[in-house]
A protein has these predicted regions:
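Bacterial N-terminal signal peptides that target proteins for export
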Residues: 1-12
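Bacterial N-terminal signal peptides
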Residues: 10-20
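Bacterial Sec-dependent signal peptides at the C-terminal "C-region" and cleavage site
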Residues: 19-30
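N-terminal mature ectodomain segment of secretory-pathway/periplasmic proteins
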Residues: 30-121
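A short, amphipathic edge element
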Residues: 33-35, 67, 148-160, 210-215
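Hydrophobic/aromatic beta-strand elements that line small-molecule binding cavities or substrate pockets
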Residues: 39-40, 69-76, 100-105, 162, ...
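Short, ordered beta-strand-loop transition motifs
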Residues: 77-84, 162-170, 224-225
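Gly/Pro-enriched, hydrophobic low-complexity segments
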Residues: 91, 114-118, 124-129, 135-151, ...
Length: 269
């Protein structure tokens, strides 16, 4: 998921500051290159070919809580294995049982990502494109854009702003802005990347008017099949006063998923 998913993260390792030390971090001589290098290493953390997970999504709005559960299947494809399929299948509550989202994410700006949703009540497959990518994902604080798993390094410009300690955790502070031609609702994102697990700890998203519209917190992280993985995410929209929490479980890598899972025709099976 762009947003929606546990596979969005990766790797950059520098010498860690000693706990309690008064040592000062070295100056960043080229923050643009350092930011890009960080993004490249982050992109390399997930070495799996495919994955499976189960999740519960709790949507909190106006004092009411709406809960949904789903399963996610993901697989890399393409000649270099850098593109990605994702299939999200909802099973609870009953009114969304059988709803499916299928995403084909491509590296680079040359080809737009493909996204469809299957609505069982209507026996209908709808293509999600244009402004509908910015609409809410299943009434949550995530958008359809956010659930696209793949974030191509070369679709953004980067700036390593420095280092910061967040709740006792040492982080790199990385800003990224979309390159011309990338279809997105966000003007920039600021990410706090943990030095120990090298996953994002937090991310702030800004709209085209440079207003803070979304805050993401990656509060629980676990090593699964040798890969550091986010297993809980909280998404807040400060202006709306709402938030969504996703808890992942039973996550497995390299399970041998067939391409047949991700065929367009499979949505109505």
């Amino acid at each position: 998921m762009t947003i929606a998913s546990h596979r969005l993260f990766a790797l950059f390792l520098c010498t860690l500051l000693l706990a309690g030390s008064a040592q000062t971090a070295p100056a960043i001589t080229d923050p643009v290159k350092a930011g890009y290098d960080l993004a490249v290493r982050m992109d390399q953390v997930d070495t799996s070919q495919d994955s499976y997970s189960e999740a519960v999504m709790s949507i909190n709005r106006g004092g009411k809580v709406l809960t949904r559960s789903f399963k996610t299947y993901s697989k890399h494809f393409g000649k270099d294995g850098k593109d990605e399929y994702s299939l999200i299948v909802f099973d609870r509550p009953a009114d969304v049982n059988g709803t499916k989202y299928l995403v084909w994410s491509y590296r680079g700006l040359e080809q737009d990502d493909d996204m469809w949703v299957y609505l069982p009540a209507e026996s209908l497959v709808r293509r999600i494109s244009g402004s509908s990518k910015f609409a809410s994902f299943m009434r949550s604080d995530l958008s359809n854009e956010d659930i696209q798993n793949l974030d191509d390094v070369d679709e953004y410009d980067y700036l390593l702003q420095g280092e910061e300690n967040v709740d006792g955790i040492d982080c790199y502070v990385l800003e990224r802005t979309p390159k011309k031609g990338k279809e997105t609702q966000y003007s920039r994102q600021v990410q706090w990347v943990r030095k120990d697990t090298l996953l994002r700890l937090r991310a702030d998203y800004y709209d085209k008017k440079n207003r803070l519209v979304k805050k993401l917190f990656f509060s629980r992280q676990e090593k699964i099949d040798g890969i550091w993985t986010v297993t809980q995410m909280r998404v807040e929209r400060p202006r709306e006063g709402s938030f969504t929490v996703i808890d992942w479980s039973n996550l497995r890598y390299d399970v041998g998923l067939s391409d047949a899972y991700f065929e367009h025709s499979a949505l109505q099976r």
